[in-house]
Amino acid sequence: MSIETLVEEIGKLTLTEASELVKALEEKFGVSAAPVAVAGVAAAAAGDAPVVEEQTEFDVVLTAAGESKINVIKAVRAITGLGLKEAKDLVDGAPKTVKEAISKDEAEKIAKELKDAGASVEVK
């Protein structure tokens, strides 16, 4: 009997039959089906420092309009596609989020545009 045939036959067993097979193998060979390696891995993982996930989504927050408010409003309109009134309200209501959940590259590009227009910006 090949191993493949044996595996297929075991696959046909019911859960009760599989449980009985495990018990019989444990008794016959004097082994335990309990996972030994899992306890070792869990203990090793507990000693490690917590893993910090790298942030993948960023928000660009306008913290202040600065001296050249008109240029900042123009930049906000270009970035967001908002109308003049909406862009002005966003700039006047600083601190406000200009763009949410964007890539790091896009966030840095937008922050640079707003800073070049005279605004104070924060990337979160």
UniProtKB/Swiss-Prot annotation:
Give me any GO biological process, just one.
Answer: translation
Q: Which InterPro entries match?
A: Ribosomal_bL12, Ribosomal_bL12_C, Ribosomal_bL12_C/ClpS-like, Ribosomal_bL12_oligo, Ribosomal_bL12_oligo_N_sf
Q: Which residues cross the membrane?
A: none
Q: Name one GO molecular function term.
A: mRNA binding
Q: Does the keyword Nucleotide-binding apply?
A: no
* Pfam short name (any one): Ribosomal_L12
Gene Ontology CC, one term: ribosome
Q: Which gene encodes it?
A: rplL
What biological function has been recorded for the protein in this entry? Forms part of the ribosomal stalk which helps the ribosome interact with GTP-bound translation factors. Is thus essential for accurate translation.
Q: Which HAMAP family match?
A: Ribosomal_bL12
Which Gene3D superfamilies does the UniProt record give?
3.30.1390.10, Single helix bin (1.20.5.710)
What are the UniProt keywords, alphabetically?
Ribonucleoprotein, Ribosomal protein
Fill in the subunit field for this protein. Answer: Homodimer. Part of the ribosomal stalk of the 50S ribosomal subunit. Forms a multimeric L10(L12)X complex, where L10 forms an elongated spine to which 2 to 4 L12 dimers bind in a sequential fashion. Binds GTP-bound translation factors.
Q: What is this protein called?
A: Large ribosomal subunit protein bL12
What family is it from?
Answer: Belongs to the bacterial ribosomal protein bL12 family.
Q: Which CDD domains match?
A: Ribosomal_L7_L12
Q: Does the keyword Ribonucleoprotein apply?
A: yes
